[in-house]
Amino acid sequence: KLAPTNLDIRNTAGSALDQILIGNVYEGIVARDSKNQVAPAIASSWETSKDGLTYTFHLNKNMTFSNGDKLDAEDVAWSINELIAKGYHDADALAAVSKVEAKDADTAVITLKTPNSNLLWTLTGRAGLVFDKDAKYDLKTQAVGSGPYTVAKFVENSSITLKANEKYWGKNKAKTPTVVVKYLADDNAAVNALKSGDVQVLAPITENLAEPF
């Protein structure tokens, strides 16, 4: 279900890409914690000006993308500016943004036209994802992110294989070396796959389908 037809998270709608790529492969300037609150991610801390128009983000040091490229404030500024300029998915949620700049390698500044109390929350989703401004790859079939996993294999409408990112800069490194996410056509096929051991985890599953287990 919800099987993605491609990996282009900047242009393709649907929750499947959010679920599999955000936090695993791509990371945002901020994230959501287990309590669904805004939490540090690429930015370790931030502050807001008294007038609510300027957000200053202080980035973690020594960050890299999965291809080994350095991740800094230039990538942050480029990613958000590109999203707005090209009208990528969720660009409309950043309508209040005037500009995004790299103050220095470790500091990114977002300036607003009018205050937006939802800005940080918006940046926990697609709008805040940070991409490698120098990387050249096919976004529909490949992914270059800064998260704990990389995309090792993608089969359209079928499966995504994630592999632990050996270059991951963060503390919460991948604990499972390889994860294969399969998208099954219907509930019965999914339950049969779980019964046979073809899959180890099944989600979502209804109460009736869970009864045999």
Question: Where does each model-flagged region fall?
Answer:
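Short, solvent-exposed loop/turn elements at domain surfaces
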Residues: 4-11, 37-39, 118-121, 159-161, ...
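Gly/Pro-rich hinge or "lid" segments in bacterial periplasmic/extracellular proteins
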Residues: 123-174, 178
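Surface-exposed binding/hinge segments that line
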Residues: 92-133, 153
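Ligand-site clamp/hinge motif
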Residues: 137, 167-212
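Aromatic- and charge-enriched surface segment that lines or borders ligand/interaction sites
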Residues: 44-87, 103, 109, 193-196
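Short, well-ordered beta-strand elements
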Residues: 1-3, 54-57, 76-79, 108-110, ...
